[in-house]
Amino acid sequence: MNTPIPAQDIRPEPAATHRSGILALDLGTTTGWALRSHDGLITSGTASFRPGRFDGGGMRYLRFTNWLTELDRLSGPIAAIWFEEVRRHAGTDAAHIYGGLMATLTSWAELRGI
């Protein structure tokens, strides 16, 4: 028996994104980002989360969390976050970094209801 599965509409509510920001991310040690703020202005750039010489293993993720919080504070509330879900990485280190950044991003967004 073939039961059709209804497709889910994963787009954010239009009213929510019209008055709030949308953030797009390319996760990695050097994270690419683009932000459409609540007033329609689009800005983009990169942010480096490369650990320093004397940093502990979790400092990269703490800096990423602080960067997200500051971006949210300065740009107005973020209503939606879009990012690519990578299925395969060439190296083990890249996979671990991506997994840590994605876990940090999803927990940060869940805490804020994004």
Regions found by a protein language model. Give the residues of each.
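Phosphate- and other anionic-substrate recognition elements at nucleic-acid/protein interfaces
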Residues: M1-I114
